[in-house]
A protein has these predicted regions:
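Bacterial Sec-dependent N-terminal signal peptides
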Residues: 1-25, 502, 507
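N-terminal leader/linker segments that initiate helical-solenoid repeat arrays
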Residues: 19-84, 88-92, 125, 491, ...
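Ankyrin-repeat-protein effector appendages
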Residues: 21-37, 155, 256-260, 324-327, ...
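Ankyrin-repeat boundary/"N-cap" motif
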Residues: 23-33, 54-67, 89-99, 123-135, ...
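Ankyrin repeat domain, specifically the short helix-to-loop turn at the C-terminus of the second helix
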Residues: 44-51, 77-85, 111-119, 146-155, ...
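Intrinsically disordered, low-complexity segments enriched in Gly and acidic/Ser/Thr residues
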Residues: 249, 256, 262, 267-270, ...
């Protein structure tokens, strides 16, 4: 117990140090780099105390932002001269600077990093080398690929974890025969496929350039065959690209080729499952529904298109898909219903719609026993998990909606946690205060033998949450199963030590 506690405290201390390091650091403000600062300005900011090597909470740093915003090469090289910025520094998603330089199409910086000995084989957390990462982002700069070639990289061997080569990865961004020929002349085969048998036509449909798709068909590319998992191009079209969704015309074109919109692969994850998350064009949904796509079909994880829509999509689309829902209280493999997902991830409007149109509130309150997911959490757990400090009004509205349906908020959740435990674990005083009126036992122990106050003593960044719990009746004398008092736990909290927080109120 003590070992786990100390590990948790060290992790929190590290995050605190990172937060302090990047607080008010203008070099970690992307808008600063969008302003195209010169080297003199950058040096001035560094002299003022802005750390040129610090990573923010998402592991981005000044070098990355300078590369992404195409700052002058002299500035990037200067930043790379700092001891804390080695060429293979591990950053966001385990990427090194070569990933970012290639992604941004910064050929001169790519050459500079290669000359400095940067790894060309380093994989990011998604299994992409620097060059594969660039191709997947749509980089078509010939000089970029030739820079890697000159450094000994065999373009034919560059693939991601799915076995997609550079041609497949970049294909959704290609628009004409000249661009296509650059890659085929390098030896990349037009009929190459990934491990699942997906060819260039499928990959190109992610950003469906219909003229380019027609060019591929003219060149004899196979577009009709299903892949090894039983999928077709509709699945890739539904996937879209980063910040891009295909319009209706692309789906109509694929249908005109004789491809089936109602394709059901082996894992059950259909195009409708993917589109249900964020498609906002009712005509696209109608195309699939007319073709027989089923909003009730479960994929391998037990999710239906309707469950996906309830978790993220706008109310109008949820209403549209709800017309053919057989059971509003269907759950996925984790025991999560549409209402649970909507309460956690979507807006109050969708929550209210589900409560009033099919999500039977009695299911959640009958006999004062709330329906639980497979871990033992009720809808109240999902309410606490939904809190966003930027949108507190949404939480308050959802809370009111659930109160109107007499949902019990003092039911014990998974692992013996009360809502007080959950809010304290998240260090969320705002939620804690909102829950104080619901007759929750503030001194209840969870399965680890900890009260909410114990957790606050271990995790708190200051005394405020502990004092609030005490004001609500939390007992400072209750010990853990290891005979530790609240004072003992707080005394070992390095975040509190760092701030010289007085703990006399716990004695």
């Amino acid at each position: 117990m003590k070992i786990l506690k100390n590990v948790a405290l060290l992790a929190m201390l590290f995050m605190s140090i990172v937060a302090v390091a990047q607080q008010d650091n203008v070099l970690l403000d992307r808008s600063f780099w969008k302003g195209d600062p010169d080297l003199k300005t950058v040096n001035q900011k560094i002299a003022e105390g802005n750390d040129a090597t610090a990573l923010n909470e998402n592991a981005f740093d000044a070098v990355i932002y300078a590369l992404l915003e195409k700052a002058d090469d002299a500035i990037v090289k200067h930043l790379l001269s700092f001891e804390g910025n080695p060429v293979d520094k591990k950053t966001h998603d385990s990427r090194i600077y070569l990933h970012w330089a290639a992604y941004a199409g910064q050929t001169e910086m790519v050459n500079f990093l290669l000359d400095k000995g940067s790894s060309v084989t380093k994989l990011d957390s998604h299994g992409y080398t620097p060059l594969a990462f660039a191709a997947n982002a749509g980089q078509k700069n010939k000089a970029l690929y030739e820079a890697f070639e000159s450094c000994g990289v065999n373009l034919l061997n560059e693939k991601n974890e799915s076995g997609a080569n550079l041609l497949l990865l970049v294909s959704s961004s290609l628009s004409n025969e000249e661009e296509l020929n650059f890659f085929t002349r390098k030896g990349l085969k037009l009929n190459s496929t990934d491990k699942d048998g997906n060819g260039i036509f499928n990959y190109a449909t992610k950003k469906g350039n219909i003229d380019f798709l027609k060019l591929l068909i003219k060149k004899g590319v196979d577009y009709k065959s299903s892949n090894k998992k039983g999928g077709n191009a509709f699945l890739f079209a539904a996937q879209g690209g980063r910040g891009y969704s295909n319009p209706l015309a692309v789906y109509e074109y694929l249908k005109s080729l004789g491809l089936d919109p109602n394709i059901v692969p082996k894992d059950g994850y259909t195009p409708l499952h993917r589109l249900a998350y964020n498609n906002s064009d009712p005509a696209i949904f109608e195309l699939f529904l007319t073709a027989g796509a089923d909003v009730n079909l479960k994929d391998a994880e037990g999710n239906t298109p309707f469950l996906n829509a309830a978790s993220r999509n706008e109310l109008a689309m949820v209403k549209l898909l709800s017309k053919t829902v057989k059971d509003f209280n269907t759950t996925n493999n984790e025991g999560q219903s549409a209402l649970m997902l909507a309460v956690q991830r979507n807006n109050p409007e969708v929550t209210e719609f589900l409560l009033n149109n099919g999500s039977d509130a009695e299911v959640y309150t009958e006999g004062h026993r709330s329906a639980k997911d497979n871990k033992g959490n009720t809808i109240a757990y999902y309410l606490v998990a939904s809190f966003d400090s930027r949108k507190p009004d949404e939480f308050d509205t959802k809370l009111k909606l659930l109160q109107e349906k007499s949902v019990q908020l003092n039911t014990t959740q998974a692992e013996g946690n009360t809502l007080f435990h959950l809010a304290t674990k998240d260090n969320n005083l705002g939620v804690l205060k909102r829950l104080s009126a619901f007759n929750i036992d503030v001194n209840s122990k969870n399965d680890e033998g900890l009260t909410a106050l114990h957790l606050a003593a271990m995790k708190a960044e200051n005394e405020e949450m502990m004092k609030y719990l005490i004001s609500k009746g939390a007992d400072t004398k209750i010990k853990t199963d290891f005979e530790e008092t609240v004072f003992d736990l707080a005394s070992e909290n390095e975040l509190l030590q760092k701030q010289n927080t007085s703990l006399n109120f716990l004695k």
